[in-house]
Swiss-Prot record:
It is a multi-pass membrane protein. Residues 27-36 have a biased composition (Pro residues). Pfam families: MFS_1. This is Monocarboxylate transporter 10.
Amino acid sequence: MVLSQEEPDSARGTSEAQPLGPAPTGAAPPPGPGPSDSPEAAVEKVEVELAGPATAEPHEPPEPPEGGWGWLVMLAAMWCNGSVFGIQNACGVLFVSMLETFGSKDDDKMVFKTAWVGSLSMGMIFFCCPIVSVFTDLFGCRKTAVVGAAVGFVGLMSSSFVSSIEPLYLTYGIIFACGCSFAYQPSLVILGHYFKKRLGLVNGIVTAGSSVFTILLPLLLRVLIDSVGLFYTLRVLCIFMFVLFLAGFTYRPLATSTKDKESGGSGSSLFSRKKFSPPKKIFNFAIFKVTAYAVWAVGIPLALFGYFVPYVHLMKHVNERFQDEKNKEVVLMCIGVTSGVGRLLFGRIADYVPGVKKVYLQVLSFFFIGLMSMMIPLCSIFGALIAVCLIMGLFDGCFISIMAPIAFELVGAQDVSQAIGFLLGFMSIPMTVGPPIAGLLRDKLGSYDVAFYLAGVPPLIGGAVLCFIPWIHSKKQREISKTTGKEKMEKMLENQNSLLSSSSGMFKKESDSII
């Protein structure tokens, strides 16, 4: 009778202890007298390890809806790309107007000084992106983009009240550019939340926004500058930033953010937890352990030392080389037209190129961008220069439209925000330095010929570096597959041995207690 009474007691003790452990649903309760015994604790520990993937499921981001509200998000992101980079790409028109407004015959370095305004602005947009990626992870795409557009509005409006070139370094080159950066980077990240299968096409459409604006803005700016002057033109451009401010409200979050992961959806504890997070929690430097991404983050900036030179100095070069030509702004329009075509065309092509092999499209684009830059000084007739600009714009669109899809392929959706942010930050250095160096060469040599020749060299070198990425990525994936297979087998054997030894120990203890 003693045996028949002790068995229910032990079963009751086990059932009462069951809710305290994190054992998964459907798992058999471990035999034994109670939770305090070490063999049962060992079994519970093994069960928790086995239940790991199941408990992580609620934090996984939902599947992209591939449409719906995403189409409105796409249009908002398209306006963002258009207003930010349309203004930047049309800076050649503003550059000439700044020379006329602030220049003096006594200053022989005015081209060099003025070039810093546009290049500093473009560089700061990319330089701030690593910081923007952190804000995007902390506060989401919507808040980051809206605040950025507001700051950009303030910077552009302030630029319309300066009386010399130097204050523009602060108002236009830093404040306006930082605001644009905070508005731009979330527009790349949010697309991956709403689209997956169509991501290449959607990125092509979004980045084509800057092409549309690059086509239209040079003519609009020329008309405005001739009619109302430089300062009122900058105030008109503030309207674009106000619309961008409104567009940012469409970035409704879908994927689980860092905020949700850390606080479990509790908004009150978000700031207190994140404010004192260690740096490694904020800046995800672990992505540089992905060798293919590290090579990509070096090759792209290396290729861009001469990339922005034509956008800043081409209009000045045309004024000097083709003085009799009217409508010189057509060269920037040509780049904008074919850049838009290239973004749509190569964005769609990228959807059919598997995995990291999309990088080969960027290699092709850098080859032609470098070659066309070298051909600009060789064009003795205006028609030839237009043809060169058309080809350059086509492959410029290719390079830009597939940047986000490649980042998704290299590091995955969870880390793509900071992956893009770090890359754009590295891009800021060559894009800031290149145009002033070209302006200095123009001041010293009297023409832009050498500047354009040298601007074509970095894209060729950077493209050669990018060729190694698919090989590095595939090699790493094979190593991971082999290692993962071995680890899974060893883990299964280890778990089985632990369960067997724990069970035998418990049965032995139970028999001892019965005796």
